[in-house]
Amino acid sequence: MEQKAFTRFNDEGVLILTLDVPGEKVNTLGQGMIAEFEAILDEIGEDDSVKAVVIRSGKPDNFIAGADIKEFTRISSAEEGEALSRAGHAIFDKLESARVPVVAAINGTCLGGGTELSLACRYRVATDDPKTSIGLPEVMLGLIPGAGGSNRLPRLVGLVKSLDMILTGRALRASRALKAGVVDEVCPRPILLDVATRAARGLAEGRLKPRRAGIPLKERLLRPVIFKKARASVIKKTGGHYPAPLEAIDVVRRGTATSLAEGLEIEARAFGRLSAGNVSRALVSVFFATQEIKKDAGYPKGTPARDVEKLGVLGAGLMGAGIAGAASTVGVRVRMKDATNEALGRGLKYVRGTLEERRKRRSLTRLDVGQRLDRISPTLDYRGFGRADLIIEAVFEDLQLKRRVLAETEAATAEECVFASNTSSIPIAEIAKGCRRPSRVLGMHFFSPVHKMPLLEVIATPETAPEALATAVGFGRRIGKHVIVVRDGPGFYTTRALSPYLNEAVWLLTEGAAVEDIDRAMTAFGYPVGPVTLLDEVGLDVAAKIGKVLVQHFGDRMALPPATDTMVADGRLGRKSKKGFYTYDGRKKKRVDETVYSLLPDGTKRRSVATRDVQDRLVFAFLNEAVLCLQDGVLRSPRDGDVGAIFGLGFPPFLGGPFRYLDRMGAGAAVGQLEKLRGIHGARFRPAAMLEDMAREGRSFHAA
């Protein structure tokens, strides 16, 4: 017999509906649950003993997480997307027009379709539990709220508040949701059912009248201004690459100017267009990829991992301090070592600064900041490292230095302690050469700034023990990172794939292209920053050093132009030296440092380069190297390559990652473009053998 999602209890006329989808950690709005809910609503309409209804969750920290996202992957046309949206409208229209008042009792996450269900209820009560959050994150999947949320929310709280929620996808804590008018009441978790039941009785008896702000008069008068500003803001932030926020603005604008029924029809058509589009499909694929890597971590299932309670960090620079701050935030005690008190002081100051940023945004209190800082103890020696579960080395990118600190660490730590290098390019096996415990050594490549960048690349050598790998991966997930596991090799995946992309930007500069034209072309393509700006952030000296490591292993395709050494010798190390391709004079708007051109061939004489030519050269250099990483076994799967590129390197999410993008264009088209570039620019554009094979056989990287 099929298990039911709902259980019922009639409390003297108030029907308590408890939603607990069987066999799932969270409640989702799947087809079976929706059908059962609709049948219950029909029964309520005919049952005079029911005077009011309370809907609550049987899950401990979740009300409803939203729709079953797998259903979105089955949409093959705009018409199918419209039908799915209209089905949601039908059930929530029935809920909204129910014979008796319905109260949503919200505890835990209430997102997407869960929020839309609550909006169709007469009254909403939420707990003040920290895990309670209410939001409409559909825009993050390239969609809009398609079950009535794009119409009901603005009618409830007004245009400005609803647009902010819908366009950002941000979820609100209960207190903010109350202030915004999204919920009607907030209470402690233990009394949620009592408060919701009392509200249901009050509504049924006419004693309780919910407050409804609606669309304020000021917003009605300023409608054109509000929508114009919202549209301009979206285009500025997204470059117009994401259609969902623009569709959302249009749906709210048109929907609130007509009846709810007509507004819902506008919403359904927009949802249909988006759900069948390439951007939504790409973003949904990224979502599933991030879920899959949590289950497939590159080591046997059931491998025991050390629970990291004490962490040692070697180096108090931006990376070391960032790692220490991330660890302390999740309750890990950190021992941070550097060579001088001055360096340690700068590291602690940096951590404090990142925490204070969060305090100013009210996501931390002063007490929280103090507790996190108290978990980090600075040191000039290895005292305290003997009790560490994991050591992360974040010293300068120098092989001999890294070998020395590894040897010192092994002498100061327990046998089972795991040692991780944060190197961005040096093979881990070379660092571990001659060490006493190679099975406990691996790489943990963080990205800067650590508190903002969501990727962690864990590098395993052939000798790395599964237990050590499990410990590193577990720690990475604990601090909130998307973790990919790659095989050891020069540059691993991310640095190796990024290098030809950055190199090509420098080659363009030596051929006469202007700095701003290159950066503008790549931000227009969808990258958050241009490659020349990124070189200034990384440091041209670092790029040159990495380039030399990669050339040793991969030959001339990784070579930077000779002018690179000239620029490094001139002290053009980027932001850190306040001298690079751009000026760093304290002004908000950066300017190109025109004097850099005197160090390049053709001097200050610049030529116009077509945006498409810039994009083709840089993007195909990147795509080809990504395929070579898969071909060489550095990457375990195309999925990992997509996740790594998007969350570590800024590859445009709306393209789904390099391998999804190649699937979309077709391997044959990619090989053709690479051959064209090879004919113009030389052997560095030679297509990967794997890509040529796939073109011949008509295969794709992903099954669907």
Give the ranges of each region predicted by the language model.
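Conserved CoA-thioester-binding segment of acyl-CoA-metabolizing enzymes
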Residues: 1-56, 93
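N-terminal glycine-rich phosphate-binding loop for ADP-containing cofactors
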Residues: 8-10, 20, 74-75, 84-87, ...
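Structural motif
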Residues: 14-18, 52-56, 103-105, 125, ...
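Structural preference for long, well-ordered alpha-helical segments in enzyme cores
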Residues: 37-40, 44, 117, 323, ...
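Glycine- (often His-adjacent) and acidic-residue-rich active-site loop
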Residues: 57-91, 110, 140-142
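Glycine-rich beta-to-alpha active-site loop
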Residues: 58, 89, 94-141, 145, ...
